[in-house]
Structure formats: C-alpha cells, structure tokens
C-alpha cells in the first residue's frame, strides 16, 4: 500500500514538472538544461522529411534566422531557419536520414557557456525517441492550405521484444513452418524450403511436400533480365504521385483544344523587347499567363474550386506555373495576375523559377493558386498534350510548341493565296464537377480572342 502511495505521488510530481516546462525543453538530472530541436512541419501536407546538409556543427552558435539544416519536404528542398538563440550541442539525425517523422528529435540546443561535452553520449532515446508519424491532413485542410501550429507529437511506444529473439523478425527472415523429418529430407535432396507451400496442419511443410518438389521437373532457366537501377523515391516524388493519382480518380476531367494564332503576339513581343533596352525580356508564356487572367475575369466560373458543400469562386487570379526542377515538378504561383503588367509578370516568373530550381521556394510561393499553366512549347517535338488538374483547382492549360501553318487568304483582287501563320495548340483540362462543357468552351473562346488580339493584354 505504501509503495502505491509513493508511486502516485511520484507520477503527480512528474506531471506537474512537465506542465511547467516549455514544450520543446526537457530537463534531465544527468544532463545540463537543454532544448530538443524537433523535425518541423514546413508545409501543411508534410508528415515526414529527409535530413539534408547540416549548416551547423556541434559547438557552433546559432542566432535567430540562421539556417540550421536543409530538409527535403514533400514539396521541395528547404532551409530550416532556426528562430532561437543558443549553441548546437548534439546532432541526433545525421545527413541522409530519410522519413523522419514531424516532431521527432533531430538535435540538442543549449545555452551559451554550457559544456557540450556532457552530451557526447546523449542518444535519441534520451530525447524521447522518434515521434509517431502524424495522420495525413484532411482533404479540406489540404485545399485551404492553411499553415497551422504543429501539435506536440508523442513518442511512439517501443515494440515489446520477445524473449526468444530479442527483437521482432521480418517475415522473410522467419524459419518456415516445417516438420523435423521434412527439414532433414529437404537438406538431403537440396530442396529450398522457402519456395514450398505446406499442405500439413496450419500450413506446415511435410515430407510429402518435399518429395513432390524434388520430383517436379526443373523449371527452365530464366532468361537474364535487363540491367536496371533502383532510384530512391523522394518525398516530393511521393507527393506528386499521390496528388495526381487523386486528381485523376476524383476529378472528372474533360478537355477543350484550340489552335491559336500567335503571329500578332510574336510581333508585339518583339517590339516590346526591342524597346525595353534590357529592362525586361518578355516570353510567350508571360503573355499566356496574362491571357489566362483576362479569360478568367470574363468567365469567372473557371477560376473556382470544389469544396465540401460549395464551389468557391475566387476574386483574384493566381496562376500556378509548372516548373521542372532536378527533383520533380513544382508549381510556384504568380499572384493577382489580373492586376499585374507584362513586365511584372515576367520578372516574377523568372524569380520564382530560379528559386524553384535552387530549392529555395517558401511555402507561400507554391501554396494556393486558382488555375495552372504547363508550357512545353520550348520543346519543338511537343505539338500538343493534355495536363492533369492541380487539385483543388478546376482547370489547367497545356501549351504546345509554335509551328508555322499555311492558311488560305483572299486577296483584294478576289484571288486566293496562302500565308504562313504562327500557331500554337493549347488544351485546357477542366474539372466537370465545377465547370460545365459550355462554360469551358466559352473560356477557351475568350482566351483565343485575347491571344489573337494581344493589344487587349495592355489595357
């Protein structure tokens, strides 16, 4: 009885001590006061991350705003800018460690003047162990892309070790369920037990099973397979795969294709770039981004998103621009395109594309967006293609390369001739839950009108 009373008092003391201590700080009798640095949630969809290069080593001082470590999230390679002051005492997760759950300890921070040698033997278990991977966010939360504080994660319970092995064994390493006689016979006949399916009680391999396997004709030698290389899947690639698979299965796509004459647009682009004196260099994509915004203001139903119970129609046009990076595709956003001029759009796209390729995008650079554009026009082999909608958006425009097309014209004297016209083929993908076929066609008509009369983009 006395032991139970003392135990309850001790537990109460521990609870009070934990309640008084900051959430990131743990105090241990055998170590000086210290703070446990945990894996942060750098995007709303992030549940785990890979550890990149540490920018600080044990003993280095850290000031607010300095980069502590590079972290590969489900979106991009990002810098973890630390917001506290102190000295790095111990690294718990080394460069290259993968799938570290949000909330798991990754390092130890102490105040300046603390002897960091006291932490030489400090382990992950001393910091509370790895956190359990948090559950995936609800779809509505993903759609809103709101950044919320990450709740403190609880440590995952250690698996109970068995007395026979001391640890849980992988299924492939377990001894097959086999009788002693069958095991002996298999050894004599050189029959691999792992390849057999037992017919005895509970799936046990019997002598008869071994005899049948030994008497069976040898399988023809398999032809040597083609050489291959297994490439590890990054968190970003996993996220791309998951989101696009969900988009195809949950968003009923329909497609509208049109040929657009860009002869006037190319002449206007050349004239503007010639007079810019190096201040800017407009691309065809810059004009198309602006044209998307104009079409969306004229047909606002396309600039919308499917939400639970409502269709949300946006007042501003935020265009997500697909950018290919060494680690995968990402879509940084040009916000408020309807209010921006071509020069500003061009500068913004160039800045975002550079940050994307350098892995320097912030969450606010790619979270959100109301409509997307994917342009493969720089590849002369791509005449046209269709793109998958970037959820929760309702539309994406796929742009092919520019080609010269012979078009018939009627001369003033009544004769007919041929002129060469620069054209591109564009295909818009629409979410039929949000956009009806007639609405998608109307949007494409407005886009065609403004692209083929590009002076309207300057209004």
Swiss-Prot record:
The record marks 384 as: May form a delocalized pi-electron network with Arg-384 of 2 other E2 subunits within the complex, which greatly improves protein stability. Residues 1-28 form a transit peptide. It comes from the Eukaryota. GO terms for cellular component: mitochondrion; pyruvate dehydrogenase complex. Residues 177-214 form the Peripheral subunit-binding (PSBD) domain. Its EC number is 2.3.1.12. Residues 145-165 have a biased composition (Low complexity). Pfam families: 2-oxoacid_dh, Biotin_lipoyl, E3_binding. It is found in: Mitochondrion. Its cofactor is (R)-lipoate. Residues 34-110 form the Lipoyl-binding domain. It catalyses: N(6)-[(R)-dihydrolipoyl]-L-lysyl-[protein] + acetyl-CoA = N(6)-[(R)-S(8)-acetyldihydrolipoyl]-L-lysyl-[protein] + CoA. It is an enzyme of class 2 (transferase). Its main location: mitochondrion. The 10-megadalton pyruvate dehydrogenase complex contains multiple copies of three enzymatic components: pyruvate dehydrogenase (E1), dihydrolipoamide acetyltransferase (E2) and lipoamide dehydrogenase (E3) and catalyzes the overall oxidative decarboxylation of pyruvate to form acetyl-CoA and CO(2). Within the complex, pyruvate and thiamine pyrophosphate (TPP or vitamin B1) are bound by pyruvate dehydrogenase E1 subunits alpha and beta and pyruvate is decarboxylated leading to the 2-carbon hydrohyethyl bound to TPP. Eukaryotic pyruvate dehydrogenase (PDH) complexes are organized as a core consisting of the oligomeric dihydrolipoamide acetyl-transferase (E2), around which are arranged multiple copies of pyruvate dehydrogenase (E1), dihydrolipoamide dehydrogenase (E3) and protein X (E3BP) bound by non-covalent bonds. The Chaetomium thermophilum PDH complex contains 60 E2 units, 12 E3BP units, about 20 E1 units, and 12 or more E3 units. The units are organized in 1 E2 60-mer, 4 E3BP trimers, about 20 E1 tetramers, and a maximum of 12 E3 dimers. The peripheral subunit binding domain (PBSD), serves as a selective binding site for other domains of the E1 and E3 subunits. Belongs to the 2-oxoacid dehydrogenase family. This is Dihydrolipoyllysine-residue acetyltransferase component of pyruvate dehydrogenase complex, mitochondrial.
């Amino acid at each position: 009885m006395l032991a139970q009373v003392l135990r309850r008092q001790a537990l109460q003391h521990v609870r009070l001590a934990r309640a008084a201590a900051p959430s990131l700080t743990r105090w241990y009798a055998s170590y000086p006061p210290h703070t446990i640095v945990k894996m942060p949630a750098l995007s709303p969809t992030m549940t785990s991350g890979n550890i990149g290069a540490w920018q600080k080593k044990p003993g280095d001082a850290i000031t607010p705003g300095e980069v502590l470590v590079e972290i590969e999230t489900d979106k991009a390679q990002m810098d973890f800018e630390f917001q506290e002051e102190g000295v790095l005492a111990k690294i718990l997760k080394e460069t290259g460690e993968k799938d570290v759950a949000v909330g798991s300890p990754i390092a130890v921070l102490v105040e300046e003047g603390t002897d960091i040698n006291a932490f030489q033997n400090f382990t992950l278990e001393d910091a509370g162990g790895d956190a359990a991977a948090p559950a995936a966010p609800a779809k509505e939360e993903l759609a809103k892309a709101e950044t919320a504080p990450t709740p403190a994660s609880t440590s995952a319970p250690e698996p109970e070790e068995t007395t026979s092995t001391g640890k849980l064994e992988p299924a492939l390493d377990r001894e097959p369920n086999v009788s002693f006689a069958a095991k002996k016979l298999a050894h004599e006949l050189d029959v691999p037990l792992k390849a057999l399916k037992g017919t005895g009680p509970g799936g046990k391999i019997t002598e008869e099973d071994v005899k049948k396997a030994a008497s069976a004709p040898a399988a023809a030698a398999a032809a040597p397979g083609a050489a291959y290389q297994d490439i590890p899947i990054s968190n970003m690639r996993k996220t791309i795969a998951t989101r696009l698979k969900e988009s195809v299965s949950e968003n009923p796509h329909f497609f509208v294709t049109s040929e657009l004459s860009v002869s006037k647009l190319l002449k206007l682009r050349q004239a503007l770039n010639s007079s810019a004196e190096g201040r800017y260099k407009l691309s065809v994509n810059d004009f198309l981004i602006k044209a998307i915004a104009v079409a969306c203001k004229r047909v606002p139903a396309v600039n919308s998103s499917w939400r639970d119970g409502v269709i949300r129609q946006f007042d501003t046009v935020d265009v997500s621009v697909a950018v290919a990076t060494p680690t995968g595709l990402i879509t940084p956003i040009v916000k408020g395109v309807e209010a921006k001029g071509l020069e500003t759009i061009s500068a913004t796209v160039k800045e975002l594309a550079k940050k994307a390729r350098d892995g320097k995008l912030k969450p606010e650079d790619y979270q959100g967006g109301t409509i997307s554009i994917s342009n493969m026009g720089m590849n002369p082999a791509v005449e046209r293609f269709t793109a998958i909608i970037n959820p929760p958006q309702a539309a994406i425009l796929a742009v092919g390369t520019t080609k010269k097309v012979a078009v018939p014209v009627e001369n003033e004297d009544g004769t007919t001739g041929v002129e060469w016209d620069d054209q591109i083929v564009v295909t818009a993908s629409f979410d039929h839950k949000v956009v009806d076929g007639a609405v998608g066609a109307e949007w494409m008509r407005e886009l065609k009108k403004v692209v083929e009369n590009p002076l309207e983009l300057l209004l």
